[in-house]
Amino acid sequence: MPLSTQPFVEANKDRLLEELKQFLRIPSVSTAPEHKADVRRAAEFVAQAMRDAKLENVQIIETKGHPLVYADWLHAPGKPTVLCYGHYDVQPPDPQIGRAHV
């Protein structure tokens, strides 16, 4: 972890861990139609986290599938552009994981 972020993480680790747990509790299984609302809820969670981080132009963009979450912060002219790309959905649990083998 870069030294510049370490004091922030140390000072906020309980809150950050609780926020991560809240996010992980959302069953955002994108391949399961019964979790469509949960995927939407996960997108809204991510959008709010971006707002809380002071990103700007936060948008939930509708698509033919699941929503896309976008934000930017364009206040560093002359500095390199950074693109962060990821997904906020999860895969269904593997029924074999966590089962006792007989």
State the predicted function of each range.
Residues 2-99:
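Acidic/His- and Gly-rich active-site-bordering loop/insert found
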